[in-house]
Amino acid sequence: MATWAQLNFQDAASPMMEQLHYFHDHTMMVLVIITIMVAYIMGTMFFNKDVNRYLLDGQKIETEWTIVPVFVLVIIAMPSLRLLYLLDEVNEPSITLKTIGHQWYWSYEYSDFKHIEFDSYMIPYNEMEESGLRLLEVDNRTTLPMQTQVRILITAADVLHSWTVPSLGIKVDATPGRLNQTSFFINRPGIFFGQCSEICGANHSFMPIMIESVNIKSFINWIQNMSEA
């Protein structure tokens, strides 16, 4: 997760977030080149003492500064469109997780298993362990297997919410009366944090998301323990 004074993205934990990192770097490279070029042109014009009193138009340069921006936009738009389609793709999921947003907590249902559902509340600061993370710890973690394609169905019971986990490259609106879906693939074990990213009332800041990624064997044991509880 992000640390103090970190200026970059969180470490990617899914292939899609890695692709978003690459796209960000690609776009920033284009923007830096344009910024340097424009600064150089403005600097040379500012310190240039030459005057042309007879310049009325310049069809050649007007054509150039129309074609070049179009070319730059294509360079940025093509990988962006590719990512948009990839983010919307749901590829044969092995597990389905249903998430319901409430004021102000999350409910989870594992649709592929019987009677596995729970609520996830933020742990207050005065009840948290010393090693805990303020405003991010929850009483029930959402456990998911790594190296597995997961589909998540997202809705809300009252107002608009948004289920967001930056390390996985996920941000999906939770809308009352509507079921949104997306998929993701966690490529390493760990604990990944997120929060509601849609202002949903007084306690909007106290709706953390805590994903624990484990191997398949540990996930099956967790499922068995939850089924017996």
From Swiss-Prot:
Disulfide bonds: none annotated. The keyword Transmembrane helix applies. One of its GO terms (molecular function) is cytochrome-c oxidase activity. It catalyses: 4 Fe(II)-[cytochrome c] + O2 + 8 H(+)(in) = 4 Fe(III)-[cytochrome c] + 2 H2O + 4 H(+)(out). Its EC number is 7.1.1.9. It is a multi-pass membrane protein. Cu cation A2 binds at residues 196, 198, 200, 204. One of its GO terms (biological process) is ATP synthesis coupled electron transport. It is found in: Mitochondrion inner membrane. Residues 49-62 are mitochondrial matrix. Its main location: mitochondrion. Keywords: Copper, Electron transport, Magnesium, Membrane, Metal-binding, Mitochondrion, Mitochondrion inner membrane, Respiratory chain, Translocase, Transmembrane, Transmembrane helix, Transport. CDD domains: CcO_II_C (cd13912). Cu cation A1 binds at residues 161, 196, 200, 207. Its cofactor is Cu cation. PANTHER family: CYTOCHROME C OXIDASE SUBUNIT 2 (PTHR22888:SF9), CYTOCHROME C OXIDASE, SUBUNIT II (PTHR22888). Belongs to the cytochrome c oxidase subunit 2 family. Component of the cytochrome c oxidase, the last enzyme in the mitochondrial electron transport chain which drives oxidative phosphorylation. The respiratory chain contains 3 multisubunit complexes succinate dehydrogenase (complex II, CII), ubiquinol-cytochrome c oxidoreductase (cytochrome b-c1 complex, complex III, CIII) and cytochrome c oxidase (complex IV, CIV), that cooperate to transfer electrons derived from NADH and succinate to molecular oxygen, creating an electrochemical gradient over the inner membrane that drives transmembrane transport and the ATP synthase. NCBIfam families: CoxB (TIGR02866). This is Cytochrome c oxidase subunit 2. It comes from Sympetrum striolatum. The lineage of its organism: Eukaryota, Metazoa, Ecdysozoa, Arthropoda, Hexapoda.
